[in-house]
Design a protein with these regions (language model features):
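N-terminal export/assembly segments and adjacent metallocofactor-ligating motifs
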Residues: 1-190, 227
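Flexible, glycine/charged-enriched surface loops at secondary-structure junctions
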Residues: 47-51, 193-198, 245, 276-283
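Conserved short loop/turn motifs at secondary-structure junctions
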Residues: 55-62, 223-226, 249-256, 288, ...
């Protein structure tokens, strides 16, 4: 972090871009804010408040004030054009939580300290250091499961940096849903599901049970690449473990069936009696109760707002960022004409970056809040320097 904090390339003064030359020059905060305000007011007067859009990237999610104030700003304007990095890697996880628990902010995390069996699907914490969970020294924690007699099984098409250290089940890309349904099928067929717990804690299990029975491992093996006998053993071992957790991350969210996969990951824990249980998937106690804050801030939503193009649902208030370029170039009420980004680089991280890059040049106003010049904000009219975590009050979320 010292390298970032003191990086000579870091943006520490407001920068204004000359559209004719593309060059940035240093300006005062007063000049930048005055011009941004005037141009934003002109755009809103001409095309309405719903012509303003905002995208914030992954680092912004780790600052409680940033997330709340960005959404508050957009709510104050009355614009639905709120986008985040979540639609690239985790929105379907949140959507599954909304369907299962009634809130997209309720996400179970593996109890690494107490589990005896960890099944990871599409996760590579040796590189990511964990995602949607906070686990300091996660490598040591994972090895600790094995050292105390437990198992860590990594389901991934690639023998990832994490998979090399533990048991690896290679699965064909985008077939996780078939594999997980087959595991549920085994639990039902062999009477390994905790039916009493399911009857007590869930509604709709009968429909899931019936669905799962249509995916026996012998019929899905050709699609998933996982031999039927191996998958049956895996399902039995999961059910037979003293305390088991199932954890999916980015890889499990990037296929065509990401929401279903996230739903099935939690259903496996439900079916084996390991959801909301020590050593299983637990709902943590963060410094900030995210589900309560999200509800109070009006972010605890799924499908409350639909996108102008395609009618796609919001997740936690955010629309799919893959729509940005089209929303900027498609005429009509609600076309984005003024745009803000913060802590993000959607040209690099979102689908069809070249189209977005071209669309940015046609805006009336583009303002970026960041600590670096990047592939996206090099098209901005202004780059306003932001803080690192060492320079502001914050709480870990």
């Amino acid at each position: 972090m010292t390298d970032v904090q003191n990086d000579p390339d870091r943006v520490i003064h407001p920068l204004r871009r000359d559209r004719a030359t593309g060059e940035f020059e240093r300006v005062s905060w007063e000049a930048a804010i005055a011009d941004i305000g005037a141009r934003l007011r002109r755009t809103i007067a001409a095309t309405g408040p719903n012509s303003v859009g905002w995208y914030f990237g992954n680092p912004g999610a780790f600052s409680y004030s940033h997330a709340l104030w960005v959404k508050g700003f957009m709510e104050g304007l009355g614009s639905p054009h709120y986008y985040t990095a979540s639609s690239q890697d985790v929105a379907n996880r949140f959507a599954a939580s909304a369907l299962l628990y009634g809130s997209p902010a309720l996400v179970p995390i593996p109890d690494l300290h107490r589990t005896s069996f960890l099944l990871m699907v599409g996760a590579n914490p040796f590189v990511s250091h964990g995602s949607v969970l906070t686990a300091p020294k996660i490598k040591e924690q994972l090895h600790g499961i094995v050292e105390r007699g437990g198992r860590v099984v990594v389901v991934d098409p690639r023998r990832s940096e994490t998979a090399r250290h533990f048991e690896h089940v290679p699965v064909r890309p985008d077939t996780d849903a078939w594999m997980l349904l087959s595991m549920l099928c085994v639990l039902v067929e062999e009477h390994l599901a905790d039916e009493a717990s399911l009857a007590r804690e869930t509604t709709g299990w009968a429909r899931v049970r019936e669905l799962a029975l249509g995916f026996p491992p012998e019929e899905t093996a050709a699609r998933t690449g996982v031999p039927a006998d191996e998958l049956r053993r895996l399902a039995r071992d999961l059910a037979g473990a003293d305390r088991a957790a199932v954890y999916g991350r980015t890889g499990s969210c990037l296929g065509r069936f990401g929401t279903l996969v996230s739903f099935l990951l939690d259903t496996l824990m439900l079916a084996t009696g390991n959801l909301d249980r020590a050593g299983g998937g637990v709902f943590g106690l963060p410094a900030i109760a995210l589900d309560e804050v999200a509800q109070q801030a009006g972010l605890d939503t799924y499908g409350k707002v639909r996108s102008r193009l395609g009618g796609f649902p919001d997740v936690l208030g955010a629309l799919p960022a893959s729509l940005l370029a089209e929303e900027m170039t498609t005429p009509g009420d609600g076309q984005i004409r003024a745009f803000f980004t913060s802590a993000g680089n959607p040209v690099l991280s979102c689908p069809d970056g070249p189209a977005l890059e071209q669309a940015l040049e046609g805006l009336d106003l583009y303002v970026s809040l960041d600590i670096y010049v990047n592939e996206t904000n090099r098209h901005a009219d202004y780059i306003l320097p932001s803080t690192t975590w060492l320079e502001r009050d914050d709480l870990p979320i």
